[in-house]
């Protein structure tokens, strides 16, 4: 009696699942509840990388990019080579307009990506395309998109990103022609 079996979720586990569910609902009205739950999880386990990653996602979803950056830095301080953390750091830095730093973080995530994190590949490529495009590196953005489609051939997200990246690349190569009057 009173024994806990490994298969039984703890309060902490239930809180993280609740945060994931609330984030997954895509309803901004639920973000306050998600924030309360993730804060409670962090009170229980302040060194939890997963909780800090979720805190970053909640802050990002509410538009608080500085809080998202602080949360992801807390996660990366505890697990500096975690691909998901490096991805989120890149995404948040991109949102803050710090594109070169964002690109470095995304590239670092690619370098440490293992088979277990294959689910992250499509998002990494998409974020890389977005950042390269924001930097005005349209040829590189198109190439990254093509590489992403090669690795994730069924990606509707990358196919959707290819057209704007390609248009930006072509637009950048057009010359202004002076007409005679």
Where are the predicted features?
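Short hydrophobic short-linear motifs embedded
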Residues: 7-8, 174-179
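Structural signature of tandem alpha-helical TPR/SEL1-like repeats
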Residues: 27-37, 62-74, 98-108, 135-144, ...
